[in-house]
Amino acid sequence: MARNVVVIGTQWGDEGKGKIVDWLTDRATGVVRFQGGHNAGHTLVVGGEKTVLHLIPSGILRENVTCYIGNGVVLSPGALLEEVDMLEQAGVDVSGRLRISETCPLILPYHIAVDGARELAKGMEKIGTTGRGIGPAYEDKVARRAIRLQDLFRPERLACKLKEVLDYHNFLLKNYYHAATVDYHQVLDDCQIKAERIRPMVADVPKLLFEASQADNNLLFEGAQGALLDIDHGTYPFVTSSNCIAGAASVGSGVGPQMLNYVLGITKAYTTRVGSGPFPTELSDATGEHLAQRGNEFGSTTGRPRRCGWFDAVAARRSIQINGVSGLCITKLDVLDGLETLRIGVGYKSKQSGEMYDALPFGADDLAAAEPVYEELPGWQERTAGIRNFDQLPQAAQNYLKRMEEVCQTPISMISTGPDRTETIVFHHPFG
């Protein structure tokens, strides 16, 4: 009986999803990306070799796995081919195992130009995007003016649609942002060149996924970013431009929701955030520096330092609720090694009224007006990195994990104690 698993981040991204997806693909025949674009950064370590993927699903490093990019992904042809070349130079067969939905909206140079001009214009109020054109590409999709992957293979349609959409964006760039415009012929020529390399990988992804599931093949749906960055349920407006929650796996790939059997929520043992936006448990002291240095907390896509803080159970519970999380995978436990005392944010208190509440507010302003209520637990000095058996963890680490489980009101299925595939403790395998 086929079992399909959705892997999502329960925080603000960077939870370590790439390593877990790579580990889970041992029992999957297909891995599906269903939202986001090359703003994601999934880091995999196999046999000591580090690979960072931004667009192609993490299952590509398993020879028996077919990878799919669903319609919910905004696709940069240039970023795609750069990643294909990088992997194939390393001996990985990509073009023979990657299938891309023809209805993916494209990210083209004018999206990147608008993204950069917009952030520059906002100054101190900027969102902190990756500058890769993700937001403007999703805007075109919703406005029904997007150029989709299928358009690359219809030259007359491509030329006409590109002229129309580029006139619109160049008007904005020139007259509103006072920025340089984008050349039509250069974009058109580049699209036509890249089209022939991409054509063999284009497929009817919903049909292939349905057939794979009907044939009792396990599928893994790989989320990007994290639930707290979701365009609807995140800390708006400091969010990404797509739906990052588990429900998006259905919409963004073309499979029915009844085909999704298990949701694995990836959660760091502490909390991080990149870019702007409220972060109640953020630490600006020596402990925050410890987390940043030990956790190597620098964005794999932008290289920006991540903001670090204590584990926020209130935010985690909201993510668990909106995703219907079946089980948690706790990552980066080893980063807490050496800390005398640990804290978990178990509630919020209004900075103005002192009112207590235990649910994540909707919207950035309300969250910024909250301060965390902490519960303290003893830390541990022993090393947890690489441990593969729960009973071998220090007692204080075991107690910390049990408390995380209690305050999240969700069972822990897995624990990651290091970046390599093998550095994993498993209580319940999502594929059964």
UniProtKB/Swiss-Prot annotation:
CDD domains listed in its UniProt record = AdSS
Q: What is its main location?
A: cytoplasm
| Enzyme Commission identifier(s) | 6.3.4.4
- Cofactors that this protein relies on: Mg(2+)
- Provide the reaction this enzyme catalyses: IMP + L-aspartate + GTP = N(6)-(1,2-dicarboxyethyl)-AMP + GDP + phosphate + 2 H(+)
Q: In which pathway does it act?
A: Purine metabolism; AMP biosynthesis via de novo pathway; AMP from IMP: step 1/2
One GO biological process term = IMP metabolic process
Annotated substrate binding lies at: 300-306
* InterPro entries recorded: Adenylosuccin_syn_GTP-bd, Adenylosuccin_syn_Lys_AS, Adenylosuccinate_synth_dom1, Adenylosuccinate_synth_dom2, Adenylosuccinate_synth_dom3, Adenylosuccinate_synthetase, P-loop_NTPase
Q: Which GO terms describe its molecular function?
A: adenylosuccinate synthase activity; GTP binding; magnesium ion binding
Cofactor: binding details: Binds 1 Mg(2+) ion per subunit.
For the ligand (IMP), the binding residues are 14-17, 39-42, 130, 144, 225, 240, 304
Q: Which residues form the active site?
A: 14 (proton acceptor), 42 (proton donor)
Top enzyme category = ligase
The annotated subunit structure for this chain is: Homodimer.
Question: Into which family does the record put it?
Answer: Belongs to the adenylosuccinate synthetase family.
Role description: Plays an important role in the de novo pathway of purine nucleotide biosynthesis. Catalyzes the first committed step in the biosynthesis of AMP from IMP.
- Write down what this protein is called: Adenylosuccinate synthetase
Origin species, per record, is Nitrosomonas europaea (strain ATCC 19718 / CIP 103999 / KCTC 2705 / NBRC 14298)
Provide the organism lineage as a comma list: Bacteria, Pseudomonadati, Pseudomonadota, Betaproteobacteria, Nitrosomonadales
